[in-house]
Amino acid sequence: EGSGGSGSSGNFTTGSNIRMSSVTNTSNAGTGTGTGTGTGTATGTGTATGTGTSAGGTSAGGNASGNSGNPPPAFAITLTETLLNK
């Protein structure tokens, strides 16, 4: 803060013999300063983990079987005495 100078207007006399007193003017000048400081930090961490399993299915093989055809038909054999004696 500072103060200004002062001055005087001096004395003077009018024609009616009225004396004026001196007048002093002062002025004040003011200066102001201000500082503002702010700091901030922000930290964030994140992790994401995912696991998954899938079991495979099983498939049984088909069974294949076939018949080998029909057996030959039965037939009668007649044995004669001549064949048996040989």
UniProtKB/Swiss-Prot annotation:
Q: How is it modified after translation?
A: Phosphorylated with a circadian rhythmicity, probably by the double-time protein (dbt). Phosphorylation could be implicated in the stability of per monomer and in the formation of heterodimer per-tim.
Q: What is its main location?
A: nucleus
Any Gene Ontology biological process: rhythmic process
Cystines in this chain = none
Q: Where is this region: Disordered?
A: 1-86
Task: List the keywords (alphabetical).
Answer: Biological rhythms, Cytoplasm, Nucleus, Phosphoprotein, Repeat
Provide ranges: composition bias, Gly residues: 31-64
Region of interest (12 X 2 AA approximate tandem repeats of G-T), ranges: 30-53
Q: Where found in the cell?
A: Nucleus; Cytoplasm, Perinuclear region
Under the subunit heading, UniProt states:
Forms a heterodimer with timeless (TIM); the complex then translocates into the nucleus.
Query: What is written about domains in the entry's comments?
Result: The run of Gly-Thr is implicated in the maintenance of circadian period at different temperatures. Deletion of the repeat leads to a shortening of the courtship song cycle period, and thus could be important for determining features of species-specific mating behavior.
Q: What's this chain's function?
A: Essential for biological clock functions. Determines the period length of circadian and ultradian rhythms; an increase in PER dosage leads to shortened circadian rhythms and a decrease leads to lengthened circadian rhythms. Essential for the circadian rhythmicity of locomotor activity, eclosion behavior, and for the rhythmic component of the male courtship song that originates in the thoracic nervous system. The biological cycle depends on the rhythmic formation and nuclear localization of the TIM-PER complex. Light induces the degradation of TIM, which promotes elimination of PER.
- What is the protein name stated in its UniProt record? Period circadian protein
Q: Which organism is it from?
A: Drosophila robusta
Gene (name only):
per
